[in-house]
């Protein structure tokens, strides 16, 4: 594909994420490349993905799925629901095209995480970003993620009520940059860390780690939840600023 053909193909899509397809070509996504690169480091640096099976939920244009393949994952499945299914959304086809342009094998599937079950399969790493704020029933979706996780779940989300020690979440509504030409109003939730810890413990994760978002601070949080069968060696990569919310480990 010539540079002119590549540029024409890029301009044919509406991009949610800024993907670097060539040294001098970055898609004009809503989320800037610098933020995505910082998020990739925060989300994936603690993990050795060599040979891993990875599921991404809320993939948008697949930035982190593509990163997982670069980091040696043997299988990567990128999924999204709203950004890939609302009328006029083309984020799934953009993801497929980007994977082709980068010569990276990533499976794509439009999927509502609330419908996930063990029948879908099992993944060493399940990654979910912008999670709670895009789902009317995020707890049901969290159960779905648990059903397909066999080692670690990494989850990034909007947060609120950070000063309250009680587990809680607050309702959120905002325009998201997909669907119609002017975007779509999406209603969801913003949990606080005590709620996230309680939910993840209730679902059987016995080690829960936390860090603030690398560029947005405590307004967004990143959680890594490990199952009892996950080897203790997985904890070695979670150095500061990660903190262990379940130290000493539960159960």
What are these regions (language model features)?
Residues 131:
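Hydrophobic adenine-recognition pocket in adenosine-nucleotide-binding enzymes
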């Amino acid at each position: 594909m010539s540079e002119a053909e590549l540029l024409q193909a890029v301009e044919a899509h509406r991009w949610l994420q800024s993907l670097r397809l060539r040294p001098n070509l970055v898609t004009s996504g809503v989320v800037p490349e610098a933020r995505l690169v910082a998020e990739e480091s925060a989300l994936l640096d603690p993990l050795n993905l060599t040979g891993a099976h990875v599921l991404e939920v809320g993939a948008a244009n697949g930035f982190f799925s593509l990163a997982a393949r670069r980091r040696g994952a043997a299988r990567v499945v990128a999924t999204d629901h709203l950004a890939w299914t609302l009328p006029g959304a083309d984020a799934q086809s953009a993801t497929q095209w980007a994977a082709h342009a980068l010569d990276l094998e990533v499976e794509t599937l439009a999927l509502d995480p609330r419908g996930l079950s063990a029948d879908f399969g099992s993944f060493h790493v399940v990654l979910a970003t912008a999670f709670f704020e895009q789902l009317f029933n995020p707890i049901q979706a969290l159960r779905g993620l648990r059903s397909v996780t066999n080692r670690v779940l990494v989850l990034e989300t909007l947060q609120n009520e950070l000063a309250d020690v009680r587990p809680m979440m607050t309702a959120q509504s905002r325009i998201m940059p997909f669907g119609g030409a002017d975007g779509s109003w999406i209603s969801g939730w913003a949990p606080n860390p005590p709620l996230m810890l309680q939910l993840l413990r209730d679902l059987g994760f016995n080690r829960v780690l936390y860090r603030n978002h690398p560029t947005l601070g405590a307004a967004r949080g990143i959680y890594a939840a490990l199952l009892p069968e996950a080897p203790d060696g997985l904890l070695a990569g979670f150095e500061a600023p990660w903190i262990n919310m379940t130290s000493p480990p539960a159960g």
